[in-house]
A protein has these predicted regions:
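Short hydrophobic beta-strand element within catalytic cores of glycosyltransferases
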Residues: 297-298, 302-305
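Carbohydrate-associated surface elements
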Residues: 145, 167, 227
């Protein structure tokens, strides 16, 4: 039997990785059925690791196409079954949704180990975990509480769930030899190990120590573990520094040792064998599985713990002691009692040792092997496959290389000669606003550090170009001279769009506060916008703002007023055969229905919704032909009752169509819009009137469009940003298409929108 495993894997420092490696090797080394293993390892934040030979492929957590390449590899590998190690945070997308397309394409039985099960999940988390359980042949959990949650909260059939305890290494050291090695002969060792973060409650133990040392001055508390990588990424060593200050203030330097190390299991078990009492002082009950608790009991430690779920379940029948959350006084009483009564301490250690003998990895691995043998012996009932309207494998790898080429410390250069920045043309507000939108989307979806690096560059350009009255200049020369006093209404609207998106998706408070300042300084100008595209862009920005600030009734009123202006333009210009806002189809056409679709979602207005869908259908009729997109040419546009221009075709028009169909899909869940979205995107890659790709696979930029003679090879900011925003939108739509319908829209909301269209 050949098995595939999906999860993190050493040398990546991660508890799930250690679990995956131990499980895989224990099943292989048992020699009872498993003859070959292969691992698909999860990488984080573009990190590469020197994996051992059993790792055949790695997945970049935020790269959706990696998941599809991995499932193709698994399906062709000859593996008989797949084991998925599921933990929130190791799979990409909102709530870890990127794993779903892989599971939907998997052609072999799936066994999923759930390391975390949330009692109060978000809508996304609940729906995604339910879908994973639906796709799994068996689900392994490590506590009875987990079974209760799965059945009661996630509605998983109980017969699908199997309880297999967390495994522990079958490693043993002589206690006295270990104490001698660590020079602990005269000390009473208290120990906590694992990744460090504020939720671990280390300060509870430190605050309890003065009362313990008063009676047991030989006590030593060792905290063994690095700061959790996610904590380190966002807060640095803030928590460890806080602990060090606390230790110093309580004069505990001789009694507390913080070891900032991630050690191997042999070394860890030496510490566990040497310790007198193991402590898990976690601050929250919401931990359904604790690998550190299992390891401590497997090593025969006397465990003292707060009553989080796993501890409350395991530390019964004198296998340990419990104390209340954040209760330093209670902890000191328990520890003093045990240190003063060695016979009680020894009795707990004996019970823990007895339990630990049943959860060694060889025994746990055999349970998994037996489970898979049972699954393979039964005929697999195929689940219905979802139609894959979007194929991410057709997309080039997402890259910011050309954007980096165009960006300096002032902003993004607006034009290019072929793939080289044209410094003579300087900068413009339009493109820096588009660039801000794009990097916000990129960081939200891919956590790309380069996007985070560029974000303040584009935001500071926008701030610099704002006038005292809240309007904006547009053009800036390369030597930083202003070239106009007031920019176009289009550029104003695009800036509000980007700022509105930022306010709902800012990666930190500094960028949020800057964006908020610029946004609200511009608000007094909203009522004076005349151009319909300036209005549309502004409406989109307001809609994004309102999604996270729904109580701002004044801004809702402004959005309604602007939407009514577009609706009024529609009523003034439409005829039986011309369902549009003007007497011509010009440029960036899709943003007009797009703006109304956004407003329809936020305002729940039937008149706005009807005009949005009617005009979208009209635009579709005149731009979708023979299953590809043909955007309106800008030579003479398409004037009512005249011939439409075929050239020049520009990327911003295709981008607007992608965004328009995406918002229609979000509102309705109608997969026909998903198909049209992908068709519109493929315009960039050669499914167009010229049958030529505008995307340059060498420079990673996008050409400026089609002329009647062929491709305009210049690759300016507008075109490349239009491509990247479209690319990100396709990936977002693909992600949404694999979420349950209830994630995208409730049945009631879908029904309401359908009624609004009627």
């Amino acid at each position: 039997m050949k098995l595939a495993y999906i999860g993190t894997y050493p040398p990546r420092e991660c508890g799930i990785g250690t679990f995956t490696q131990n499980l895989a090797h224990s099943m292989l080394e048992n020699g009872k059925g498993v003859k070959e293993i292969m691992v698909i390892a999860m990488n984080d934040h573009n990190q590469d690791y020197p994996y051992p030979p059993e790792v055949k492929l790695s997945i970049n957590q935020e790269q959706q196409t990696d998941y599809l390449e991995a499932v193709n590899y698994i399906n062709l590998s000859g593996a008989d079954a797949c084991i998925l190690e599921h933990e929130f945070g190791i799979y990409g997308g909102l709530g870890g949704v990127y794993i779903l397309p892989l599971l939907h394409r998997l052609n072999i039985p799936l066994i999923t180990t759930l390391h975390t099960i949330l009692e109060t999940p978000s809508y996304n988390e609940r729906a995604i975990l339910k879908e994973i359980c639906k796709m799994s042949d068996k689900i392994v959990v490590m506590s009875h509480k987990a079974i209760h949650f799965l059945v009661g909260i996630y509605k998983v059939p109980k017969e699908k769930i199997v309880l297999i305890e967390h495994g522990v290494p079958d490693i043993h050291f002589d206690k006295e030899e270990s104490r001698t090695e660590f020079k602990l002969n005269e000390r009473k060792l208290l120990l906590t190990f694992g990744f460090i973060g504020r939720n671990k409650g280390i300060e509870t133990v430190i605050k309890a120590l003065p009362q313990i040392i008063e009676k047991h001055p030989e006590a030593l508390y060792i905290v063994l573990g690095k700061t959790h990588p996610n904590v380190l990424r966002h807060s640095g060593e803030e928590y460890r520094n806080y602990l060090q200050v606390l230790i110093k203030s309580l004069k505990l330097n001789e009694h507390v040792l913080l070891l900032n190390e991630f050690i191997d299991e042999n070394e860890l078990f030496k510490y566990l064998s040497a310790c007198d009492i193991y402590i898990t002082p976690y601050l929250s009950e919401a931990q359904i599985t604790s690998g550190t608790l299992s390891y401590a009991m497997g090593a025969g430690c006397a465990v003292v713990s707060t009553p989080y779920w796993h501890a409350a379940e395991l530390l019964v029948e004198n296998k340990g002691r419990l104390f209340d959350f954040n209760d330093s006084d209670g902890l000191s009483e328990v520890l003093n009692e045990l240190l003063e009564n060695p016979e009680n301490l020894h009795e707990i250690q004996e019970h823990a040792t007895e339990y630990g003998q049943d959860i060694t990895w060889p025994k746990v691995g055999q349970k998994y092997t037996d489970l898979i043998t049972q699954v393979l012996s039964r005929p697999k009932v195929p689940l219905p496959k979802k139609e894959n309207v979007i194929d991410p494998l057709l997309l080039p790898p997402f890259s910011l290389v050309h954007i980096k080429r165009l960006t300096d410390d002032t902003g993004i250069i607006q034009h290019a000669k072929f793939g080289i920045p044209n410094l003579k043309e300087g900068y413009c507000l339009d493109d820096n606003a588009r660039a801000l939108l794009m990097v916000c989307m990129t960081y939200k979806q891919k956590k790309d550090p380069l996007a985070l690096e560029f974000m303040p560059v584009y935001l500071s350009y926008i701030h610099y170009m704002q006038n005292k009255d809240g309007t904006f200049r547009n053009f800036l020369s390369f030597n930083r001279n202003f070239l106009d006093e007031k920019g176009s209404e289009d550029s104003f609207g695009r800036t509000i769009w980007a700022l509105g998106y930022l306010l709902g998706n800012a990666p930190n408070d500094a960028y949020y506060q800057t964006g908020k300042l610029v946004f609200f300084d511009a608000v007094p100008n909203f009522d004076s916008i005349k151009s319909i595209r300036g209005i549309a862009n502004t409406m989109i920005g307001i809609s994004y703002y309102l999604r996270t600030n729904a109580s701002d009734d004044a801004m809702k009123g402004t959005l309604h007023k602007l939407a009514n202006i577009l609706v009024s333009h529609y009523h003034q210009n439409h005829t039986e055969n011309w369902e549009w806002f003007e007497s011509l189809l010009a440029y960036d056409n899709g943003i007009l229905p797009l703006a109304l679709l956004h407003a329809a979602e936020v305002l729940e207005d039937g008149d706005i919704s009807k005009v949005a869908f009617d005009t979208m259908d009209f635009l579709t009729e005149h731009t979708m032909k023979d299953d590809y997109l043909s955007v309106i040419g800008n030579k003479d546009w398409y004037v009512r009752e005249k011939e439409r221009s075929m050239f020049a075709q520009q990327p911003i028009d295709a981008e607007a169509m992608v965004l328009m169909y995406h918002q229609a899909y979000v509102l309705t869940g109608d997969r026909d819009f998903l198909k049209k979205l992908f068709t519109s995107f493929m315009w960039f890659l050669g499914e167009n009137d010229m049958r030529m790709s505008l995307y340059d696979f060498e420079t990673k930029g996008c050409c400026d469009g089609f002329e009647n003679y062929g491709v305009n090879r210049n690759q300016g900011a507008e075109s490349s940003l239009a491509y990247l925003i479209s690319h990100l939108t396709v990936l977002q739509a693909y992600e949404e298409s694999f979420q349950l319908e209830e994630i995208k829209t409730s049945k009631a909301k879908k029904s309401t929108i359908n009624e609004l269209q009627d």
